[in-house]
Each structure stands twice: as C-alpha cells, then as structure tokens.
Amino acid sequence: MSDKQTPENAVDYKATLNLPGTEFAMKANLAVREVKWLEEWYADNIYQKIRASRIGKKKYVLHDGPPYANGQIHLGHAVNKVLKDIIVKSRVMDGFDAPYVPGWDCHGLPIELKVEEKVGKVGVKVDASTFRKACREYALSQVDLQRKDFIRMGVFGDWQDPYLTMNFKQEADIVRSLGEIQKAGHIEPGLKPVNWCIDCGSALAEAEVEYEDKKSDAIDVGFGVVDLNDLSARLNVEVQDPTDIVIWTTTPWTLPANQAVALHAEIDYQLVQVQSDRGTQNFILAKDLVESAIARYKLENPVVLADFKGAVLELLQLQHPLLADRQVPVILGEHVIATSGTGAVHTAPGHGTDDYKVGLIYNLKVDNPVGGNGVYLPTAPIFSGEHIYKANPQIIEALGATGRLWAHQPIVHSYPHCWRHKTPIIFRATPQWFISMDAKGLRECALNAIENDISFVPDWGKNRIESMIEGRPDWCISRQRTWGVPIPFFVHKDTNELHPRTPELIEEVAQLIEHEGIDAWFNREAKDFIGADAEHYNAVRDTLDVWFDSGTTHYAVLRQREELTDPADLYLEGSDQHRGWFQSSLLTSIAINERAPYKGLLTHGFVVDEKGRKMSKSLGNIITPQDIIKDMGADGLRFWIASSDYRYEMTAGKEIFSRASDGYRRIRNTLRFLLANLNGFTPSTDALPVDQLIALDQYILQRAAEVQKTVQQAYEDMNFHIVCSALTNFCINDLGGFYLDIIKDRQYTTKADSAARHSAQTALYHLVQAFVRWMSPILSFTAQEAWPLIPEQTEQYVFTTEWYDIPVASTANLISEADWQTLISVKSAVNKQIEAARNAKLVGSNLSAKVEIWAKDELQSVLNQLGDELRFVLITSQVNVYPYAEQGESTEMDGLRVQISAAEGEKCVRCWHVLPDVNTHADHPGLCGRCIINVTGSGEVRKYA
C-alpha cells in the first residue's frame, strides 16, 4: 500500500513549477503613468527617432487640417487627431516615412472677438496695428493650450515646429498663392450678393453658415400688370379687370430692392378670376398651385380664363407694389419651381444668388439698399435709416394699404444662420473679390478631379463634395476684417482695373510680409509700392477669407517643407469639411496647379451622446477628452475612438466607455499573460524552429498570421474598428478561450528546459512580438510599456519597427487547421456537458471530470490523432473515445455524444489532474507519474498539445 501524502509528510512542489512572472502591471493606472512616459519619450526626441528610422523610405503624407486656435479642444478634436495618429503610425509600421506636421488656423473673426473683449474695438480704444499684435499673442497662447492636450493623447508629430497660418513665412506664401490664382485669371471683382452676418459686419464663407429653424413672415404680394392690352394680346383673351402676378416670399424687407418677377418658361400657368371684397380680381399663378393659393387668400371658385406657358409673359411690365415710380419686367428663370408658393419669384439681384444670376441675363440693376449693420441706407427708396427687421411689419402694413397683400402668415422654416453668433444672416450685394467658378473652367476641372483622381473613405464623400461643387456660387474671398492676410491689390479709381504690375507687386508685398508680417501691408501707403501711380489707384484694405488661408496650405506648407509632398496622400477631417477645408483646398489647388492637393479624402462623423444628440452646453451633455483621459487614460480614449465606426456618428457615454474599458482590459490581460509566460525564456538559445514546434503551437502561429493579414489590411483600409475587433476576438476566442488555457499545464508543469515548454514559449514570443505591433498604432502607451519587456528586445521603440514576420510551419502541419477547428467545436460541446454535470454536482472543476466520447468515423479519426494528449486540449484528466453509439448525451455537433463522470483516482498535488497513478509511488507521495518524470526524470514528451 502506498504512502498517502499527509500534512506530516507533505512535500512543497511549488518550486518545481514554472510560475509566470513579469513587470508588466495588472492595473494599468494609465492616467498617471502615461504622463511620465510622455516626458521620457519627448526628452528622447521620439518623433525625430521615428523619422530617422525611415530615412530614404517611400513617403506617406497625411496633411493636417488646421484646427482653429481658440479655446480648449473638444471631443471632436480628439477623434480627429487620434484617427490621424493611428494612420500615421500604421503607415510607419508599413515601412513608409510618414511625417506628421500639425498646424493651426490663426486668423479670423473668433479671435478678433476674443481680443475685442480685452482691448476694445479697432478705432475706438485701440489702433489696428496694436489690435493685430494682441490677436497674434492670443492665438499663440491658444496654440500652446491645444498643443499640450494633443500631445497628452499620444499623438506624435513635429510639435516643436508646427505650421501656423500667422507665421510670417506662411502669411507671405498665402499672398503668393493669391497671386498665382490671380495670374491664372480666376479672380474677379464684383458687386454680388454674399452671405452677410449683421453681427459680424462681414461676409461669411459657405462653411460658416449653419441652417436652423426660424420663424418668418410669409406673404403673398401682387405685382399688378401695367398694360392689360399687352396681356390680352399675349394670352389671346380679353382682360379688363385688375390682374396681379403674385409672388410668395419670407423676406419682406428685400421688396424695396425688387427688380423683376421670375416665371419658368416651361411651367403651366393660369389666368384665373375671382370675386373678392375689392371686386373682380384676376391672378396669374402656376396651374398646380392655383387651388392652394386661392385658399390661402380665403377666396373661392376661381374661374380659369387662360392656360399658357410662362414664356408667353416674358418682359411683360408689372407695377412694383411699394414704389409708385418703379415698373419691373417679367423674366424667365430655371430656378423657379411649381411645388410651393405661387410659381412666381420675387427677384432682387442684390439679395440672392439665383436672383443675381438671372439678373445678369436680363441686365437687371444690382440694387443693395441695406448697409452692413442691417439698416436701410440713406439712398434707399423707402425706410431709410430703419433696421430691416423693424421695417418688416411696416412693409407688410404698407402692402395692405395699397391692396397688394393677398396673404400673410407666420411660418417656421430652415434658414441660414451665422455659425458664430447663431443669428440669421442676410444676403446683400457688396463690392467683393471672388474666385470665379466658371470664368476659366474651375468648376469643371474640380469635378473632373473628383471623378478621376481622388479616392474617398467612405464612398459617399464623393457624391457629397461633388454636389456641393456643382451647385456652389463664386467664392467670395474678401472680408472686411482687421486680423487677416491682406489682398494686396491696387485698383484703378476710374476703370476698376488692377495695376498692370500686379504679379510683381504681390511678390514685393510677400517678401515684406515674410520679414514683418501682415503689418507690412497695412502700415504702408499705396505710394510706398507704386509711387506716383498712387494718385490713380486705391489700395485694397480687405483681408482674405480664413478658408483661403487654410485652403492654400498645399502651397504654403506642403510645397515649402521638404519633409512633405504636394499632393498629399490624405486629407482627413469631419464631414462638415466637404464644404469647408476639403473644398477650399481643392479649388485653390486646381486654380494654381490644375490638380487636386490630395490623393484621398477620409471623412469622420460627429460625436453624439447616447441619445444621439449633439453635445452642447445647453443640453449639459458635454464630455471632454480631458475627463475621459483622467478616467481611462489616453489609451482608453484612443481605444474608444478606434473601436467606433467613424463613418457614422460616434456615440460617447458611460456605457460606451465601459465597453471600451472592458475591451482594453481584455487586451491588457492577454498581453500580461504572454509576457509573464516568457519568464526565463532566452530566444537566442531557447527558441525552436517553427517546424519543430508542437502541433498546437504551430496552429496558433498560423492563426496569428491570418489575423495579422486582417489587421494589416484593416489598417491599410483605415477600418480601425475592424482592427479592434480582430484584436479582441483573437484574445477572447483564439488565445483566452482556447490556446492559453490549454498551454498552462505545459507551461507550468513540464521541465523548465524541455522542448515541450520551449515550444510554447517560442510561440508566445512570436505572438507577443506581433501582438504589440498590432496594437501600437491604437494603444500606443500600452504597446510601448510592454515593448522593452519582450526578451532580448533590440529596438528601443515599437514605433520604429515594421510588422513582425510571423513564422509559419513550412511542412504539412501535424494537424490541419480544419481539424483544429473541429477540435475547437468538440471542446465547446464538451464544456457545455461538463457545465451541466457541474450544476448537477457530479463533478467540480474540469480536471475532476472524466469525458467519454462517442464519435462518428470522420470525427473519431480527428480526435484519435491526438491520442492521450486529447485530454490536454479538453483540459480534463481523462478522455476516452469510442465508435459512435447511442450512449451518453447528444450534443450540438452531429455525430458526437458525450458522457461526463467523476475522474477515477486521486488529485495530483502538483498538476491537479485526477489520475489512478497518484500516490502509487512511495518516493513521491501525492504526485502522478507524469509529474514524477517532469520533476526527477527527463521530462514528458508532447507532440500535439
């Protein structure tokens, strides 16, 4: 009878086990530790070291769209910068030299408003030069503020030498780019209607306009036909009663500027007669709108006197409803529709783009009776000195008094607002400078580039920017502001022509700006540049639209910095930039270079809360990136961003962040297991050739190679949520749920220097080398934390390496991948049966179970390949496989039945397997025969698992 192990004769076998050990902490504590790592990295010039590692390699340039240098960064900024950083780091891992030069947009109204709060308005409390100096200082302070936050997120770049649109050199190059566009014939002056913010006192770019609901006065106004005989002749019907062509408008204040009424040549119209309290009245309305219009006028029973096309009435004279001395013509326009209103459009070329365009055809006067402050000018025919919004009710009252108001009702409709002030804008014609979309074929060239030269992620970005380019008006590039790059033109006082030396003068001004900044222009007079010609020329004192500043960075940054290329490989911004930076960059580059400034455009969605609402102070739902970093660290923030599908709106909130944290922990714990089990492993002496590895280890490396293909392709396609899914799924399914669980026994219980253990460690070594690289573009801090803990690491930073070459067995694997997939399915089915037996109190842990399997022929042969090692795969103490019979319990697998019972024998104190031979060896009480061989003998031999 063998001696049983008792407390008195117990031997401590712990020292004979190969226990894991690593400095890689279980608890990340990222919020604290990341700060320390950043200090070390930047003290070591990490960005420069990454660049140095790629000298001579093919370039990949992601050009940074400059955020505005004003205020703390928000979550949208974080999404944008982290996505860019992931792309740059993954391209470096691909072997590219991928420089990243961050930039800031530094001119413009928001900065002016902030500075006005401190020093007052220009010309009131401060002169323009002092004001510009204060603007420059403020912008620089905001750059410093935002730069710290971007660095804190682990975004690598040339933070010490970013581009700023207010740098003297860049201001000069912005002026030079203007000169190039002027030289190419795309710039022209004009009195044209532009988006105008009364509060800003300036024109607005298309990208500075937002649409919000607004309550307006909708009115139907009659323009009386002056010559009824002319009308009768045109319609071939006798017309004797008063006849109005009725327009419908929501901007009564624009009626003093009316110059015409537009119909559509091909729309069907009707002359209808009704009886009103004013007597017999005729209306001319679109046929499809007669019923709704007459009902709106609270009239009944219209009698149709004539049907005709709009073209019949071209140039018919109408009486202006407010101005007795003004008659206006009927004109024809393609913009007129018959789906709402009356089918007739009030036309004021000074107050609308369509009106302006059709006015050019008919040579209509571009009348603008409204000043930049929203007050009617002294030259206005009526309501001079009155604010337009205060004049609205007066205009409506006057129309009623003259009998020209047929309907008046308030409506709520979508209306353009200033993005800064959130107030309604107006359209007003002012003398401005424009980049013409069609004079030199700019629109056509831009559309051709979109169609043929640019790739889009996601695909719908193409249609979006295409439709915007197709429909956009000429680009008004001039602004009446103080803090901006000048338009250094000299305009002849009589002819309005530019000075004949304009190209040379622009270069002269640019050279001065390069040394003195924009004050070089504003602080000099015309005679300083053109001498005696100053008597005949005015110097333009307008500034450039800030979208021109950022839109010409392909010229002022990409072309000027030797580490960058023009065109760039990629521009990446939020979806609002199809009408902003993407468009301004495309148009200026086409104008200068006749090609796009980018090969690809990537668009990301906006951040919303868990209810799908945009974040705003009023809703109290703002989450800042700083708050997330305090809680989850920058890697937590980065993982949330990467795991979201940025093509759509990105949801932020506690539940979403909790899921991201869970995913991060899964990856971190897996990484810790890999590192811990490399304890004592020296790759140069202990690693085995892949063809000599145990079958299971060969399989996991083959799976890792497949995952790496998915990861690399996902990075290349910029599908980072697929990368995150691939990482977490590999951790959960392939490693945590299968491989790592199985190898624990081999890792801990076999001889330390055995081939069985070294086989597993060789696989783990290759896995961790690949795994850390996979995660490094996204989980940069955690990847670099783990990197130096990999045995015999030679590179200082993971960021200077390339994708790992995972070795895959060249000979036919001992067990095919298909058979391993079958074994995984069997393992899952067996585990469910063990769980059921555990719930029935038949067994405790898996190792206390005996598994009996009845399998059909093909399945049986797969299982029998492993022989006795099948128990290691199933993580049970005993397994028997029999030909298929109706015994045991059926499972989810066809042809597989399983019976679970308590394993026979006793529990080994070292490996915890329950085996009959435990305590049968007097010299080794408590041990199984396998452990005795591993402790005192040559060690067990494994072939499969």
From Swiss-Prot:
Cofactor: Zn(2+)
Keyword annotations from UniProtKB, A to Z: Aminoacyl-tRNA synthetase, ATP-binding, Cytoplasm, Ligase, Metal-binding, Nucleotide-binding, Protein biosynthesis, Zinc
Binding site for L-isoleucyl-5'-AMP: 573
Motif ('HIGH' region): 67-77
Binding site for Zn(2+): 908, 911, 928, 931
Motif ('KMSKS' region): 614-618
UniProt cofactor note: Binds 1 zinc ion per subunit.
EC number: 6.1.1.5
GO CC terms, sorted: cytosol
Domain topic, free-text comment: IleRS has two distinct active sites: one for aminoacylation and one for editing. The misactivated valine is translocated from the active site to the editing site, which sterically excludes the correctly activated isoleucine. The single editing site contains two valyl binding pockets, one specific for each substrate (Val-AMP or Val-tRNA(Ile)).
Family label: Belongs to the class-I aminoacyl-tRNA synthetase family. IleS type 1 subfamily.
Protein name: Isoleucine--tRNA ligase
Provenance organism: Acinetobacter baylyi (strain ATCC 33305 / BD413 / ADP1)
Gene name of the record: ileS
